Amino acid sequence: MQYLGIDLSNTDANLLFVSDGREQKLSLRTELCRDKREDRWYIDAEAYEKALAGRGSMVQGLLAESERDGLLVAEDTEYRAVELLARFLKLARKQVLGDEKAEELRTVIVLPDYRLAFVRELAALLPQFGFPAERTRLVSREESFLAFISAEPALLAAGEVGLFDLAEKSLCFYMA
């Protein structure tokens, strides 16, 4: 079985891929770059190379604009932010998986704020970007923490479970 966890924020995405006991971690900026010459999108180092060379247009703030049902502009074209976020997730998955087959991949995407209308829209879009609905789950950060502590009863009983959440504008500590 293969698992992919994606913890999203407006600036970063942290990915953890687990397959056959092997783990791979990756941290990416939550940004996209659209190539000026062709309809191709890039993330991470490739995105910065294109933008610095003047061959691409960077798009930032994907999560915040998606939650507001906003529009973002790349190369004089307006895009729905939620569609760009789904495109980013597809490219991020491809980067962490590489050439590995992902037929039984189960994906959990952790969101800092769980806004139902946004989550429903993103969940409806993700299958178009290769995330099967039956194997993709969108959860809040709090829900992911609760799932973790419920799976660790010994740590919970000893009072040894805590979580720091450092975001752009806040620092939260959750204790169980």
Give the ranges of each region predicted by the language model.
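Short glycine-rich phosphate-binding loop at a beta-alpha junction
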Residues: K101-D113
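Conserved helicase motor "Helicase C" RecA-like lobe of SF1/SF2 P-loop NTPases
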Residues: R120-L122
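A short acidic Gly-Thr/Ser loop motif
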Residues: I6-D12, A157-C172, A176
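Phosphate/oxyanion-binding active-site loops and adjacent basic polyanion-contact surfaces
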Residues: M58, E78-L89, F118
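Early-domain small/polar-rich strand-loop-helix modules and first-structured segments
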Residues: M1-L71, P127, R135-A147
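Short helix-terminating capping/connector loops at secondary-structure junctions
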Residues: E100-E104, P132-A133, L156-A157
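Short hinge/gating elements
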Residues: R68-Y79, L105-T107
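Phosphate/ATP-binding catalytic cores across multiple sugar-kinase/actin-like superfamilies
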Residues: L84-E100, F145-E152
